[in-house]
Amino acid sequence: MKLKTKKLLVAGLVSTMLLAMAQPAFACTGVIVGKDLTTDGSFIYGRTEDYERNRTMRLVTHPRGEIKKGDKLVDVNNGFEYIHQEDSLKFFSTPDSSKKPKDMEQGVYDAAGYNEAGVGIFCTVSADCNDEIAKVDPYVPTGVNEASMTTFILAHARSARGAVELLASTIDKQGASMGDVVVFGDQDEVWYMEIYSGHQYVAIKYPADKFSVFPNAFWLGGVDLNDKENVIASKDVVKVAKDAKTYVETKDGLIDLAASYNPKELRDTNRSRVWSGIHDLDPNSTIPYDADRFPLLNDLSEGSEKIDIKDALNLFRNRFEGTDYVPSDNKAERNANPDKYKRPIGSINTMQAHIFQTKEGYPKEAPGIMWMTLGSPLNIPWIPIFADINDSSAEFKNDAPTYDANSYYWVASSVNDLVSGDREDLGDSTRAKVVEFEEGLMAKLPEIEKEWLELYAQDKDKAAEFSTKKTLEMEKAAFEFEQGLQKDLSKVSKADLIDHWARKPIIETINKGYMVGTDDLKFSPNKTITRGEFVTILGRISEVDKAKYSEVKDENIESGKYYTEYMNWAVENKLLPESAKAIAGEDLTREEMAYILTQCLKLKDNTEVKKAELTFKDADKVSDWAKDSVAYLTEKEFVKGTPDNKFEPKNNLTRAEVAQIIHNISK
C-alpha cells in the first residue's frame, strides 16, 4: 500500500534515502494460501499495490554490497534513520521511478522482492488503528513506514522469521509512523505481521492449512501470545488495548486483536474485497456480504477444490463476476449508489501486483518465483521472475516518470486505459488474449525450471545467468505482446476516456470513423474543437467525395491539410456563416456549431428549418443568423442549454460535447 516517498542516493560511503511522508490510500489487497490448500504444495502469498494510475513501476536488481556497512538510510521528511549494520545482500525490488514530477509525491517504495538468502517480502497493506488506541500509543512521526522498510529488510533479512524480528526491533526502538500489514516468506515458512500503532505489533507463522484475503484493515482474531514458536508480539499489545478501553477477549481468554485495534466499522471498500476474495478462492463459501466479522484464517468449504496458482493470479483480476454487484473504480459513483456499485479487487488503479509462489524442490536461497505485473493485471500478463536474477530488461527497469513508449509499465498501462475506455466491447476479448499469452509462458516454464535446477545444483552463478537470460526473454516477449495490443486497441479506443461523461458517444464516433484521436493514444475530450475539425466530422458523416472538392474555394483555406476538401465542400454549399471567413484553425463557437450543423442537415436530408422563438435566458446574445438553427436543434433535442437555461452562444465547444451532439443526431 502506497504511503509516500523515498529516494535512494549513494555517494562514496554514505547512502541516503530521501523519504517524503503523506497519508496512505487504502486500496491494496493481500492474499495468502497455505501449501496444504494448493494443488502443487506451493505456499502462495502476494498483494496488489493500489494508489493511482500513471505512476511508474519498475523491476530493479541490486547487486550484493550495493549498500555498505555504516551507510545511513534517512527519511528526510519525518527523520526516520536506519544505519546498515552490514553490507547488503543481493536482491531485486519493484520501486517507483526515481524521477517523478515535482507535483507528484516523491519516493521509490521498493515494495516487493526476493533476496539471495531466499526471503521474499511485500510491504505493505496499509491499515489504521481506532482513535482510542491512537491516543494511548500514537503513531510516531519519525517512525519506520512502508516507504523505508522494504529496502532494509531485503538488504539484510536471512529468513522470514528474521525479517519479522528485524522489523519488530526497529519498531521497538524507533516506533512506526503508520499501521501496516506485511508478509515475509522463505523456503520453510510464511509470516504474517500486523503493525497496529506506534509500538504495537503481532506476527504469526502462517498455518499451512488456511487461506486469507486481506484488504486494508487488521484481521487477526484471538492469538496466544505465549506461543513463542509461532508468534512474535510487542510486549505491551494487551496493555495498550486495556489502557485504551478497547480490549476484547475471545471465549478462550485470548486478546481479539482485530476487535481491539480496528476502527469500529469495516469500510465497505474493505468488505467488498474480502467478501469477493473469499468467494473467489472458495466458491462454496457461505459467508454473507454483511457478515459481522470476516476471519483471517479460512478453511476451504466442502466441495471447493484446492487452489491453483492460476486461481491466485486471477484473484487480482476479480471484478465481482457471477455476483449482482457492479464493479466501480470511481469513488463518486460508488458513493452515489453504494448498494449497486462496489470497489473490486481487480482495479484500473492497481499500479503493480506480485504473488510469491514458494515451490517444492526449489533451493533454499531461491525458493520460489515472484509472479509480477507492472501495472494492473486486468489486461497485463503475469510474468514469472526467478529469485536469483541478476538483471531485468531495459523496458522493465525504465525510469521514465511520464509516458515513454520504451517503458513496459507505460505501454502496458496504456493498454489497461484503452480497454477501460470501452470495457463493454473490449474487456473480454483482450483478457482472452492476455490469458492465452500467459498460458504460453506457463507451458514453457517447467522445462525452464528443470534446466535451471540442474544448473543450480552444479553452479549457482551459472544458474543465475540462465534464469536472467530466460527472464529477459519473457520480458521481451511480454513487451512486444503489449505493444501489439496497444496498436490494435488504439484504433478503436483511447486511453484518456476513463470515467468521462461522454465516453460512450466518443467511442461511437471513433468506431464510425467520424472522429479520430489527437494522437495514437489520446482523444483529448476536454480540448476545444476547431472549425476545420467540426466541418471534417460533418463531411465524413455526409460521405463527401473528397476528389470533387480538391479545388480551393476560399483564400483562407490552406491546401494539403486534413480538412482542405471538407472546407471546400462547406464553402461551396454555403454551410458556414459569413463571420467564419472559412478559417479552419479557429475554435468553434456554440452558435456557429448550430448554424453549420443545421445547414448540413438541410443539405443532407432536406431538413426544413422554421422560424421559432428562443426561450433561453441569454437568447438576446444569440446572433440573428444563428437563432433559427439554435431553436431547431434544441427543439429536436440535438443540443441542450446549461442547467440554468442558458445557451452561451459565444462559448467554445469541447471535442466531447461534439461527440455527444453527433451521437444525438445519429439516433
Locate predicted features.
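N-terminal secretory signal peptides that target proteins for export/translocation
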Residues: 1-4
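Sec-dependent N-terminal signal peptides of Gram-positive bacterial secreted proteins and lipoproteins
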Residues: 6-24
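A contiguous strand-loop segment
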Residues: 28-145, 166-291
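Short, well-structured alpha-helical segments that form the helix of a local strand-helix-strand
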Residues: 163-172, 312-316
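Glycine-rich, aromatic-lined ligand/substrate-binding cores of catalytic
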Residues: 244-361
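Substrate-recognition/cap regions that form aromatic- and gly/pro-loop-enriched pockets
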Residues: 329-454
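Histidine-centered catalytic/metal-binding microenvironments
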Residues: 430-492, 510
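Feature responds to low-complexity, polar/acidic, surface-exposed segments characteristic
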Residues: 490-504, 511-591, 597-627, 640-652, ...
